[in-house]
Design a protein with these regions (language model features):
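Short alpha-helical elements
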Residues: 1-171
Length: 171
């Protein structure tokens, strides 16, 4: 017989770490450790924008966030992913749509740490960069056009490599 619902939820929560461990083990067997990883997030809308205020699906986990590429608000979740240079997803996490990308980096790094990380402008933070430097992680984000100190790190090569995760998302 099946366990009751609360017991089933506890079993699933306890199994999550074990399943992550198995997933990383399989990835390590079938692909080399990546030289660098790319971090990005994507919106996961649960309803059409017109229904944002009335939606009752997953109210404990979802809320209203802003999709900058479409320039519109959406009700749903946000998925944050860390993909290797070969396109495999090494770490992932889901959060409320309103949670800022910077706050998800630590969750991703708990699952898989890489010495070199590329990210987009949504992860631009001096605090985060300094914190990761202390931990021995090189964290690259392109600088914005209006920034006073434009860094030399804005190379076309790194920007081209960062586009790779967008291709993974579109599959």
């Amino acid at each position: 017989s099946l366990p009751e619902r609360s017991r089933f939820n506890r079993i699933c929560n306890n199994a999550f770490c074990f399943l992550q461990w198995i997933r990383i083990g399989i990835l390590k067997q079938h692909s080399n450790n990546p030289k660098y990883t790319i971090i990005d997030s994507l919106p996961l809308p649960l309803c059409q924008p017109i229904r944002n205020k009335r939606c009752k699906v997953l109210t404990d986990y979802a809320d209203i966030g802003y999709n900058a590429t479409k320039k519109q608000y959406y009700y749903g979740l946000k998925g944050s992913f860390e993909a290797g240079s070969d396109g495999h997803i090494w770490a992932y996490t889901f959060s409320k749509a309103s949670k800022h990308d910077i706050k998800m980096v630590e969750d991703l790094l708990r699952q898989y740490r890489c010495q070199y990380i590329l990210a987009d402008q949504g992860y631009l933070s001096n605090e985060l960069k300094k914190k990761l430097e202390k931990e021995g992680i090189w964290f690259w984000t392109p600088s914005r056009k209006n920034m006073k100190e434009k860094k030399q790190e804005n190379s076309k090569f790194l920007k081209k490599k960062r586009k790779y995760i967008e291709t993974v998302f579109s599959k």
